[in-house]
């Protein structure tokens, strides 16, 4: 299928609103700035965002309230770990996503990877995930809408002043 690869080295990239590609959004390097769910492909399918390259720093920065849940898809966009990745949520921003998922390529690249949550805003996961990645909450809040959002994570670290909250 068609997908988008962000390979910005140490730069930043923003995608236009109302993108209709049906595949995934893959972050190999650099920072993908996200301010609207429609920037990440067709919202009827709500394909995942994937961190793909352990050799380079990969960041997804959420700059405004983005709710990736879609009535048509029946779920929020998942974040898939094939490499280390950082989700930075700007101050005052509350963003809703699906689950933190394992590597779907069969290569088990989520094992040994780390998701780092930075920024003063709130990253809300609305489903239980499958990743075996380590999870670091360095700033802001990581919130779960279900009781066990990270059942297989290799570790969970919450820094001073950061918050981890589970729901239901």
Regions flagged by a language model, labelled:
Residues 1-14, 22-95, 102-124, 132-168:
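Beta-strand repeat architectures
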């Amino acid at each position: 299928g068609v997908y988008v690869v962000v390979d910005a080295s140490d730069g930043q990239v923003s995608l236009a609103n109302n993108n209709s590609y049906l595949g995934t959004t893959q972050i190999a390097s650099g920072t993908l700035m996200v301010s609207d769910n429609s920037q990440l492909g067709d919202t009827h399918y709500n394909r995942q965002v994937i961190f793909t390259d352990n050799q380079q720093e990969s960041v997804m920065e959420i700059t405004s309230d983005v709710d990736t849940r879609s009535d048509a898809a029946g779920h929020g966009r998942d974040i898939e770990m094939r490499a280390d990745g950082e989700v930075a949520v700007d101050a005052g921003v509350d963003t809703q996503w699906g689950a933190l998922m394992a590597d779907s390529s069969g290569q088990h690249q989520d094992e040994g990877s780390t998701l780092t949550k930075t920024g003063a805003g709130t990253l809300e996961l609305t489903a239980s995930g499958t990743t075996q990645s380590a999870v670091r909450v360095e700033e802001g809040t990581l919130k779960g809408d279900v009781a066990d959002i990270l059942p297989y994570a290799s570790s969970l670290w919450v820094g001073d002043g950061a918050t981890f909250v589970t729901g239901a």
